[in-house]
UniProtKB/Swiss-Prot annotation:
Enzyme class (EC, first level): hydrolase
GO molecular function: nuclease activity
PANTHER family in the cross-refs: POLYNUCLEOTIDYL TRANSFERASE, RIBONUCLEASE H-LIKE SUPERFAMILY PROTEIN
Main location as per UniProt: cytoplasm
Protein's name according to its UniProt entry: Putative pre-16S rRNA nuclease
Keywords tagged on the record: Cytoplasm, Hydrolase, Nuclease, Ribosome biogenesis
Stored InterPro entries: RNaseH-like_sf, YqgF, YqgF/RNaseH-like_dom, YqgF/RNaseH-like_dom_sf
UniProt record similarity statement: Belongs to the YqgF nuclease family.
Biological process terms in GO annotation: rRNA 5'-end processing
CDD domains: YqgF
Length: 139
């Protein structure tokens, strides 16, 4: 089986949830949550994870509207993703991320690992779900 190293991203206005996968491309794991302050800071932190994980691709959750259209937030995510893809010199694949934050919160609550104060945990878990969906679709 071909080795794959991907980073899953749940991009929001305030935070970016980051997930990575094992070398076999079977299991996604939450890595960190980046608190967004500036584009430069976002890029620097993502670049560190790309280097550390030897990432070959970015898998980004795209927040489609419930009717399947691309709303304002989805277009903002695409715009940001085009910029980071260019700077980091990595290809991007999008995954439909509708309801991943709801699913992430439910998973964390069921695992008793949820605090209403830790929004970053939801973002990390959402990034994990996004990346896992992409990994599963490749099998």
């Amino acid at each position: 089986m071909e080795r794959i190293s991907a980073l899953g991203l749940d991009i929001g206005k305030k935070r970016i949830g980051v997930a990575g996968c094992d070398g076999t491309g079977l299991i996604a794991t939450g890595l960190t949550t980046i608190e967004r302050t500036s584009f430069q800071s976002d890029v620097e932190q993502l670049h560190q994870w790309v280097k550390e994980r030897e990432a070959q691709i970015l898998v980004v959750g795209l927040p489609y509207s419930m009717d399947g259209s691309l709303g304002f937030q989805a277009k903002q995510v695409q715009k940001f993703t085009r910029r980071i893809s260019h700077v980091l010199q990595l290809p991007v694949e999008y995954v439909d991320e509708r309801l991943t934050s709801v699913e992430a919160e439910a998973q964390l609550k069921s695992q008793k690992r949820f605090s209403t104060w830790d929004k970053g945990a939801i973002d990390r878990q959402a990034a994990t779900i996004i990346l896992q969906q992409w990994l599963d679709s490749r099998r």
